[in-house]
Amino acid sequence: MAVKHGVDGDGSEIESRTLAVDRKSGFCESTSIFYSKREPMALPPNQFLDVTSFIASQPHRGKTVFVDAVTGRRLSFPELWLGVERVAGCLYALGVRKGNVVIILSPNSILFPIVSLSVMSLGAIITTANPINTSDEISKQIGDSRPVLAFTTCKLVSKLAAASNFNLPVVLMDDYHVPSQSYGDRVKLVGRLETMIETEPSESRVKQRVNQDDTAALLYSSGTTGTSKGVMLSHRNLIALVQAYRARFGLEQRTICTIPMCHIFGFGGFATGLIALGWTIVVLPKFDMAKLLSAVETHRSSYLSLVPPIVVAMVNGANEINSKYDLSSLHTVVAGGAPLSREVTEKFVENYPKVKILQGYGLTESTAIAASMFNKEETKRYGASGLLAPNVEGKIVDPDTGRVLGVNQTGELWIRSPTVMKGYFKNKEATASTIDSEGWLKTGDLCYIDGDGFVFVVDRLKELIKCNGYQVAPAELEALLLAHPEIADAAVIPIPDMKAGQYPMAYIVRKVGSNLSESEIMGFVAKQVSPYKKIRKVTFLASIPKNPSGKILRRELTKLTTSKL
């Protein structure tokens, strides 16, 4: 078995390592490392290369790249790249330079990738904000990333204004009427995206040299410590993601985009990776099951990228769906965000026998790449997330002792690959605790790798809650709860849900004399957070179990919850 990942030197060194690697599992006894069984992917040697130029240079025969599912507007590949070049010229004229941060607050749109690709082509950094986030949440992101410019829609400009505490220049992404209300000195409207797309650059801009190691995107994640941090993804990270997609998927396919482009799953696929493969991407502004299925039928989609709750919904509504929609063009569902159970997978295949489900596993910190399934045969390994992706190395580490483990032993998964992030933005301490000196990313997930090299995710060591594919940090919700005048103590844990995967649940200790109710607590939190962060269940306790150092014993609470389900 040829193993080339992370190996320097001549062929004899590679060969000597090859002899120590188990062909079935990919495990090397001498290094205690699992090596990918996939064919290694080639990465461009040119150090001075931005991801936009790399994507634009990829060979394919695709004609239409984006279709607006609502309006029917289509963008060809030449129109995409002309738009990217023109918007980049306008951004340069506005003073955007290499290293500057530009924020985009927008639902899915066929124009979203034009913005992100043009920003990255300048060597500037795109940061994405979720439209369903509250103004307070967006304000924290703005305060941390300090953008020099924002792109948003007319409907969201008021939310952006509420989130900004300085005169943030804004470019509007649509042509709807902007309310005449004043936004004070919080935002300054400086242009419209459609005008930029039609504008020839007025001056010959000096193109700054972009290094593959420069930061291209800043996506916010709860990380491994539970507080939101900016994940710095380099041009090299995104180029490696494109090559991983090329190894996994065919060229010139058709798909529907419903996953938010602000999320790594959507950004990596629909705003970067799949463009390089010549795919046609039909864009829905937000998820709607009927519109999704109708789009599959109308546009003859061959692939769908879905989060587990949507897969579950398709299983539960299979009879009606199959009688109402023609899904004969669909042959592959790519599932990510959380593992699918064997029961759900089997029922899906039973109801949609011509469709295979390819599961995958990744993090924002790994540019969404870690493990994946490539073909129908691999889908039969129920519960698995697939094999380690090309060029990915893995280690299983005992979280208590630090001892490196082997095949079929459960511990924290560490990975090393060209897709591992540069680090957390302006947070050296968090970066050092997440990536070690040898480049190993500590995923915070308890996993094991079986004798055939398949990765199984067992639990979340890092305690994050995954609700509808989004990360929810218990610490954030606990801080909110403890701010309530009638709450003495609080702990938040996940509660399993067939559709959402998990929901946040709170254990509450009321202050003496308080009669605070479950509904009052849920309402208190709901007013301050995004929908996926809402508390869905409350249980009252006399005290929260903690260890001597004061750390919440979440596993004890999980046991208590499980016993009551």
Curated annotation (Swiss-Prot):
Residue numbers covered by motif Microbody targeting signal: 563-565
Residues annotated as binding CoA: K286, G469
Catalytic activity: (E)-4-coumarate + ATP + CoA = (E)-4-coumaroyl-CoA + AMP + diphosphate; (E)-4-coumarate + ATP + H(+) = (E)-4-coumaroyl-AMP + diphosphate; (E)-4-coumaroyl-AMP + CoA = (E)-4-coumaroyl-CoA + AMP + H(+)
Cellular compartments per GO CC: peroxisome
Swiss-Prot/TrEMBL keywords: ATP-binding, Ligase, Magnesium, Nucleotide-binding, Peroxisome
Stretches for region SBD2: 360-424
Domain characteristics, as noted in the entry: Both substrate-binding domains (SBD1 and SBD2) are involved in the substrate recognition, and are sufficient to confer the substrate specificity.
The protein's name: 4-coumarate--CoA ligase-like 2
Organism listed in the record: Arabidopsis thaliana
Gene behind this protein: 4CLL2
Reported cofactor(s): Mg(2+)
Location, primary (coarse class): other
Residues annotated as binding (E)-4-coumaroyl-AMP: F265, G337, Q359, G360, T364, K462, K466
Assigned EC number: 6.2.1.12
Annotated segments matching region SBD1: 288-359
PROSITE patterns per the UniProt record, alphabetical: AMP_BINDING
Annotated Gene3D superfamilies: 3.30.300.30, N-terminal domain of ligase-like
Record-linked InterPro entries: AMP-bd_C, AMP-bd_C_sf, AMP-binding_CS, AMP-dep_synth/lig_dom, ANL_N_sf
